Protein backbone atom coordinates (compact mmCIF):
# COMPACT_ATOMS: atom_id res chain seq x y z
CA UNK A 1 0.00 0.00 0.00
CA UNK A 2 1.34 3.43 -0.99
CA UNK A 3 1.45 6.31 1.44
CA UNK A 4 -1.82 8.21 1.83
CA UNK A 5 -1.92 11.40 -0.27
CA UNK A 6 -5.47 12.58 0.47
CA UNK A 7 -7.00 15.05 2.91
CA UNK A 8 -5.23 14.22 6.17
CA UNK A 9 -7.67 16.04 8.46
CA UNK A 10 -10.53 14.02 6.98
CA UNK A 11 -8.49 10.94 7.80
CA UNK A 12 -8.03 12.05 11.42
CA UNK A 13 -11.78 12.57 11.77
CA UNK A 14 -12.35 9.06 10.42
CA UNK A 15 -10.08 7.55 13.06
CA UNK A 16 -11.29 9.97 15.75
CA UNK A 17 -7.79 10.85 16.98
CA UNK A 18 -4.98 13.22 16.06
CA UNK A 19 -2.39 11.51 13.87
CA UNK A 20 0.00 14.49 14.03
CA UNK A 21 -0.30 14.91 10.27
CA UNK A 22 -0.98 18.67 10.25
CA UNK A 23 1.70 20.14 12.47
CA UNK A 24 0.99 23.86 12.79
CA UNK A 25 -2.82 23.52 12.75
CA UNK A 26 -2.63 20.74 15.35
CA UNK A 27 -0.33 22.68 17.67
CA UNK A 28 -2.51 25.80 17.41
CA UNK A 29 -5.74 23.89 18.14
CA UNK A 30 -7.22 24.74 14.73
CA UNK A 31 -7.42 21.29 13.20
CA UNK A 32 -10.67 19.93 11.78
CA UNK A 33 -10.73 17.31 14.55
CA UNK A 34 -10.77 20.07 17.19
CA UNK A 35 -13.79 21.62 15.50
CA UNK A 36 -15.69 18.48 14.47
CA UNK A 37 -14.81 15.47 16.60
CA UNK A 38 -16.82 12.99 14.53
CA UNK A 39 -16.40 11.13 11.28
CA UNK A 40 -16.48 12.88 7.90
CA UNK A 41 -19.34 12.74 5.43
CA UNK A 42 -23.13 12.78 5.62
CA UNK A 43 -23.30 9.94 8.12
CA UNK A 44 -20.22 10.87 10.12
CA UNK A 45 -22.07 11.18 13.43
CA UNK A 46 -23.82 7.84 13.07
CA UNK A 47 -22.44 5.05 15.26
CA UNK A 48 -21.90 1.69 13.59
CA UNK A 49 -20.80 -1.63 15.03
CA UNK A 50 -17.42 -2.84 13.77
CA UNK A 51 -16.28 -6.48 13.66
CA UNK A 52 -13.16 -7.66 15.49
CA UNK A 53 -11.35 -7.88 12.16
CA UNK A 54 -12.51 -4.37 11.29
CA UNK A 55 -11.14 -3.03 14.57
CA UNK A 56 -7.81 -4.79 14.05
CA UNK A 57 -7.50 -3.54 10.48
CA UNK A 58 -8.41 0.01 11.48
CA UNK A 59 -5.76 -0.01 14.21
CA UNK A 60 -3.08 -1.12 11.77
CA UNK A 61 -4.13 1.53 9.25
CA UNK A 62 -4.10 4.17 11.97
CA UNK A 63 -0.54 3.26 13.00
CA UNK A 64 0.67 3.21 9.39
CA UNK A 65 -0.89 6.59 8.67
CA UNK A 66 0.42 8.16 11.87
CA UNK A 67 4.02 7.09 11.23
CA UNK A 68 3.86 7.31 7.42
CA UNK A 69 4.92 3.72 6.82
CA UNK A 70 4.02 1.54 3.83
CA UNK A 71 2.45 -1.89 4.27
CA UNK A 72 5.67 -3.62 3.19
CA UNK A 73 7.76 -1.67 5.70
CA UNK A 74 5.20 -2.11 8.46
CA UNK A 75 5.05 -5.88 8.02
CA UNK A 76 8.85 -6.05 7.97
CA UNK A 77 9.01 -4.16 11.28
CA UNK A 78 6.39 -6.51 12.73
CA UNK A 79 8.44 -9.55 11.72
CA UNK A 80 11.46 -8.08 13.50
CA UNK A 81 9.34 -7.19 16.56
CA UNK A 82 8.05 -10.76 16.70
CA UNK A 83 11.60 -12.13 16.47
CA UNK A 84 12.84 -10.11 19.45
CA UNK A 85 12.39 -11.20 23.05
CA UNK A 86 9.53 -9.66 25.00
CA UNK A 87 6.07 -8.41 24.07
CA UNK A 88 5.65 -8.24 20.29
CA UNK A 89 3.30 -5.25 20.38
CA UNK A 90 5.59 -3.22 22.61
CA UNK A 91 8.58 -4.18 20.46
CA UNK A 92 6.67 -2.97 17.40
CA UNK A 93 6.08 0.51 18.81
CA UNK A 94 9.62 0.80 20.15
CA UNK A 95 11.11 -0.16 16.77
CA UNK A 96 8.93 2.32 14.89
CA UNK A 97 9.96 5.06 17.31
CA UNK A 98 13.59 4.37 16.40
CA UNK A 99 13.09 5.21 12.72
CA UNK A 100 15.25 8.17 11.71
CA UNK A 101 12.35 10.22 10.32
CA UNK A 102 10.43 9.74 13.57
CA UNK A 103 13.46 10.68 15.70
CA UNK A 104 13.95 13.89 13.69
CA UNK A 105 10.26 14.65 14.33
CA UNK A 106 10.56 13.83 18.04
CA UNK A 107 13.53 16.19 18.33
CA UNK A 108 11.31 19.03 17.14
CA UNK A 109 13.14 19.74 13.89
CA UNK A 110 9.87 19.26 11.96
CA UNK A 111 6.20 19.69 12.88
CA UNK A 112 5.13 16.46 11.17
CA UNK A 113 6.72 13.11 10.43
CA UNK A 114 6.16 13.78 6.74
CA UNK A 115 8.23 16.98 6.94
CA UNK A 116 10.88 15.12 8.94
CA UNK A 117 11.01 12.43 6.25
CA UNK A 118 11.63 15.10 3.61
CA UNK A 119 14.49 16.54 5.65
CA UNK A 120 16.07 13.09 5.75
CA UNK A 121 15.51 12.13 2.10
CA UNK A 122 16.81 15.49 0.86
CA UNK A 123 20.06 15.01 2.75
CA UNK A 124 19.59 17.64 5.46
CA UNK A 125 20.21 15.25 8.39
CA UNK A 126 23.49 13.95 9.79
CA UNK A 127 23.88 10.85 11.97
CA UNK A 128 27.12 10.86 13.95
CA UNK A 129 28.44 13.54 11.59
CA UNK A 130 27.64 11.69 8.36
CA UNK A 131 24.76 12.40 6.00
CA UNK A 132 22.11 9.70 6.05
CA UNK A 133 19.10 9.88 3.72
CA UNK A 134 17.27 6.69 4.73
CA UNK A 135 14.09 7.50 6.74
CA UNK A 136 13.66 3.86 7.82
CA UNK A 137 17.11 3.65 9.44
CA UNK A 138 16.86 2.44 13.05
CA UNK A 139 18.67 4.91 15.32
CA UNK A 140 20.80 3.31 18.05
CA UNK A 141 21.38 4.42 21.63
CA UNK A 142 23.96 7.18 21.91
CA UNK A 143 23.78 8.32 18.30
CA UNK A 144 23.85 12.04 17.49
CA UNK A 145 21.23 13.38 15.09
CA UNK A 146 21.99 16.80 13.64
CA UNK A 147 20.56 19.19 11.08
CA UNK A 148 23.12 20.00 8.39
CA UNK A 149 24.85 23.36 8.92
CA UNK A 150 23.41 25.00 5.80
CA UNK A 151 19.90 23.90 6.80
CA UNK A 152 19.98 25.13 10.41
CA UNK A 153 18.74 28.59 9.38
CA UNK A 154 16.01 27.18 7.12
CA UNK A 155 12.76 29.05 8.00
CA UNK A 156 10.76 25.81 8.16
CA UNK A 157 13.20 24.25 10.63
CA UNK A 158 13.32 27.42 12.75
CA UNK A 159 9.52 27.69 12.73
CA UNK A 160 9.15 24.01 13.63
CA UNK A 161 11.39 24.41 16.66
CA UNK A 162 9.43 27.46 17.80
CA UNK A 163 6.14 25.56 17.55
CA UNK A 164 7.36 22.29 19.08
CA UNK A 165 9.01 24.07 22.02
CA UNK A 166 5.61 24.16 23.72
CA UNK A 167 5.13 20.37 23.51
CA UNK A 168 8.40 19.33 25.16
CA UNK A 169 10.85 16.57 24.23
CA UNK A 170 10.34 12.88 24.94
CA UNK A 171 12.46 11.49 27.84
CA UNK A 172 14.66 9.19 25.73
CA UNK A 173 16.05 12.09 23.70
CA UNK A 174 18.28 15.04 24.68
CA UNK A 175 18.18 18.08 22.38
CA UNK A 176 20.41 21.13 22.09
CA UNK A 177 17.91 23.36 20.34
CA UNK A 178 20.28 26.29 19.76
CA UNK A 179 22.78 24.01 18.03
CA UNK A 180 20.03 21.96 16.38
CA UNK A 181 21.22 18.52 17.31
CA UNK A 182 20.03 15.80 19.63
CA UNK A 183 21.21 12.57 21.21
CA UNK A 184 19.10 9.42 21.13
CA UNK A 185 20.07 8.47 24.68
CA UNK A 186 18.24 5.16 25.00
CA UNK A 187 15.43 3.01 23.66
CA UNK A 188 11.98 4.11 24.89
CA UNK A 189 9.76 2.10 27.19
CA UNK A 190 6.27 1.49 25.81
CA UNK A 191 4.55 3.46 28.58
CA UNK A 192 6.63 6.50 27.64
CA UNK A 193 5.39 6.52 24.05
CA UNK A 194 2.13 8.45 24.07
CA UNK A 195 0.34 7.44 20.87
CA UNK A 196 -3.35 6.48 20.41
CA UNK A 197 -2.54 2.96 19.22
CA UNK A 198 -3.64 -0.39 20.64
CA UNK A 199 -0.80 -2.51 19.30
CA UNK A 200 -2.45 -5.65 20.73
CA UNK A 201 -5.03 -5.45 17.92
CA UNK A 202 -2.27 -5.22 15.30
CA UNK A 203 -0.56 -8.31 16.71
CA UNK A 204 -3.88 -10.17 16.61
CA UNK A 205 -4.36 -9.17 12.96
CA UNK A 206 -0.93 -10.31 11.80
CA UNK A 207 -1.13 -13.50 13.87
CA UNK A 208 -4.12 -14.87 11.96
UniProtKB/Swiss-Prot annotation:
InterPro entries xrefs: Ribosomal_uS4, Ribosomal_uS4_bac-type, Ribosomal_uS4_CS, Ribosomal_uS4_N, S4_RNA-bd, S4_RNA-bd_sf
Record-stated family: Belongs to the universal ribosomal protein uS4 family.
Q: What does this protein do?
A: One of the primary rRNA binding proteins, it binds directly to 16S rRNA where it nucleates assembly of the body of the 30S subunit.
- Gene name for this UniProt entry: rpsD
Indicate yes or no for the key word rRNA-binding.
yes
Task: List GO molecular-function terms, semicolon-separated.
Answer: rRNA binding; structural constituent of ribosome
User: How is the quaternary structure described?
Assistant: Part of the 30S ribosomal subunit. Contacts protein S5. The interaction surface between S4 and S5 is involved in control of translational fidelity.
Q: Which Pfam family name is an example for this entry?
A: S4
Q: In this entry, which stretches build a coiled coil?
A: none
Query: Where does it sit, as one GO cellular component term?
Result: small ribosomal subunit
| UniProt-listed GO biological process terms | ribosomal small subunit biogenesis; translation
Superkingdom per UniProt: Bacteria
**Region Disordered: start and end of each range?**
31-50
PANTHER family on file? 30S 40S RIBOSOMAL PROTEIN (PTHR11831), SMALL RIBOSOMAL SUBUNIT PROTEIN US4M (PTHR11831:SF4)
Q: Where is the S4 RNA-binding domain?
A: 98-161
**Keywords (A to Z) from UniProt:** Ribonucleoprotein, Ribosomal protein, RNA-binding, rRNA-binding
What is the protein name stated in its UniProt record?
Small ribosomal subunit protein uS4
PROSITE patterns referenced in this protein's UniProt entry, alphabetically: RIBOSOMAL_S4 (PS00632), S4 (PS50889)
Amino acid sequence: MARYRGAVERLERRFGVSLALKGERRLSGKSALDKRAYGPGQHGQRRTKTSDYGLQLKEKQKAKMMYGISEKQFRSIFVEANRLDGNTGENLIRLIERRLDNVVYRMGFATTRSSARQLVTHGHVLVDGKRLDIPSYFVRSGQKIEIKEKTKSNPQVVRAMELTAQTGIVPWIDVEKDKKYGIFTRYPEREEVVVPIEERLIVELYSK
